[in-house]
């Protein structure tokens, strides 16, 4: 599935092929722009970070087709993953079009704290498909803030109310994209 950590060895065992074959196939998907690997950010000093990359398809439609999804229920897990994928692809497009030479990564600790996207050391972004955000949605961002590295901590959601609290911003997804393309979060 798109946006999931990819374990080359497990995938190779499931397919009964050598791990090098899986690595080559994933490389082929990247070369043909069908998908890309999002590396894990491992510079965390306070919490041990997972080092496994995530794989994203270039388009949520590919993910839906492979999953056999004809309609997307707003309350489904796939809807949330698709929304995350959409925001991730917008960030990736922004970095490419603006020729920003910043690392694009994600962070996950061994204790399960996670932040969906990191742009260099400037911006940490958590994506939630919910229409009403809560303090619980900031868990990963708050854990990452303890590192004192990133300048912006942003929760992107479908909640139309934009808020700011103690260096954290909760932004409606359209506002986030407007601000992203206006260069407000990155170099």
Regions found by a protein language model. Give the residues of each.
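Accessory nucleic acid-recognition modules appended to NTPase machines
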Residues: 1-123
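Nucleic-acid endonuclease domains
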Residues: 59, 113-114, 136-139, 147, ...
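Short beta-strand/turn micro-motifs composed of small residues
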Residues: 108, 155-157
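Short active-site-adjacent structural elements
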Residues: 114-115, 133-136, 161-165
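Active-site ExK catalytic segment of metal-dependent nucleases
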Residues: 120-133
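Structural beta-sheet core signal
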Residues: 124, 154-155
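Short, charged, amphipathic alpha-helix that recurs within catalytic cores of restriction-modification
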Residues: 130, 135-149, 153
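Domain-level recognition of nuclease-like catalytic cores that cleave nucleotide substrates
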Residues: 160-187
């Amino acid at each position: 599935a798109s946006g999931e950590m990819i374990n080359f060895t497990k995938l190779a065992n499931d397919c009964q092929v050598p791990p090098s074959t899986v690595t080559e196939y994933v490389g082929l998907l990247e070369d043909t722009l069908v998908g890309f690997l999002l590396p894990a950010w491992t510079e965390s000093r306070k919490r041990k970070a997972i080092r496994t990359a995530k794989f994203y398809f270039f388009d949520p439609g590919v993910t839906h087709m492979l999953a056999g999804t004809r309609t997307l229920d707003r309350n489904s897990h796939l809807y949330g993953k698709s929304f995350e994928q959409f925001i991730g692809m917008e960030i990736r497009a922004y970095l490419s079009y603006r020729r920003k030479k910043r690392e694009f990564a994600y962070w996950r600790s061994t204790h399960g704290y996670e932040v969906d996207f990191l742009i260099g050391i400037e911006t940490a972004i958590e994506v939630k498909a919910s229409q009403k955000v809560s303090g619980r949605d900031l868990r990963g961002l708050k854990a990452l803030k303890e590192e004192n590295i990133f300048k912006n901590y942003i929760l992107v959601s479908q909640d139309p109310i934009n808020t700011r609290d103690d260096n954290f911003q909760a932004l409606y997804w359209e506002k986030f994209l407007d601000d992203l393309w206006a260069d407000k979060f990155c170099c």
